[in-house]
Amino acid sequence: MTTYFDINLDLTAEDKALREEAHKFAKKVIRPIGIEIDRMSAEDAVAEGSPLYDFMKQAYQLGYHKAAIPEEFGGLGCTPLQTHMIWEELYWGNLGLAAVVSLAGWPYFKLLGSGNQELIEEFVVPYCNCDDASISGCWAITEPDHGSDTMNAGENFFHDEKVKGQLQARLEGDEYVLNGQKSAWVSCAPFATHAMVNLQIDPSKGMAGGGVCILPLNLPGVERGAPLEKVGQRDLPQGEFCHIRQQYQILPWKFPY
């Protein structure tokens, strides 16, 4: 398979088999579908019957969406090296489509870090058991006026109370009310079922008063903008969340930055 010298002489037979399978999938499935989607409009790329979903279903059936998740939760339990090799091959096939599957698991993989078993059972286990791509995630971090400023904890503005996030979570009794907007370039937003959402909880602390939640996107009050037309990487659908006004019973996973 490889056309280069393999400098890692310690790969096991399992490692090599996983890499070979991922390479074949990238060549035979990902590349042709990536070319097809690149020629489609943004709206058609995420419409019912799009080859995007055929690709996702095949990727899910091979377990690539859960490669890094431990077996105890239903994942493949791949080692870090195996996970790296799988993604290297998939991204070789097509950057956009590989990112689709990678981001599909982002909220669920990150949720494992919370250690909350109730939430893991509610969100992670069903995702791992899914083999038809009917459950997928995205990461709603960027905002129209801020980009991904909420990640820049080392910058002076991070603690500036004048810097207001565009998606706010306000505590009312035992519930949080989410109100605001995310950017028009949230990858996988047009079709994701859940989002890992970065938002602002305490505006008096600036971006430092932020947190994270896992948001089911079928809740009343969640609106999505139109799919984004792009010059390049058209095989990675992007879109917008706007006007989120949702009485959310709990903010499942929050922490002060």
Task: Locate each region found by the language model.
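Short Gly/Pro-enriched turn/cap motifs at secondary-structure boundaries
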Residues: 156-160, 186-187, 203-204, 229-235
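A short core secondary-structure module
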Residues: 175, 179-223
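Short Ser/Thr-interspersed hydrophobic loop/turn segments at strand-loop and sheet-helix junctions
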Residues: 63, 86-91, 215-219, 243-247
